[in-house]
Structure formats: structure tokens, C-alpha cells
Amino acid sequence: MRIVKGDKVKYLDLEGVVISNPYMYITDMENYIDVYFSKVKETMTLKINDLEKVD
């Protein structure tokens, strides 16, 4: 399932923390995605495999 901007995602390495509606910038379509965390006002580059979509 493809993750797109505005999706709620769960970052699996952070004990399943739900990131609500992050701003995402694709860096490398296959492997990496930049996610802006509004709570900590920080952009992190994460592996797409470490993210899980939340309904």
C-alpha cells in the first residue's frame, strides 16, 4: 500500500507512534521518505519500510 502526503502513519521503530497527517517529501521513491513531525518541528528521513499506514 502506497503512502502519500496526508496519510496517518505509524513509525514502527518508535514503538508504533502514530504520526497524524505528516507532510511528506519523497527523496527516493523506492526506499526513503522525508516526514515532517509537527510535534517536534523536525524533518526526518525514514525508510518507507519502517512506516505503516493507519486508518
List PLM regions with ranges.
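Basic/aromatic-rich interaction segments and small domains that mediate binding to polyanionic partners
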Residues: 1-55
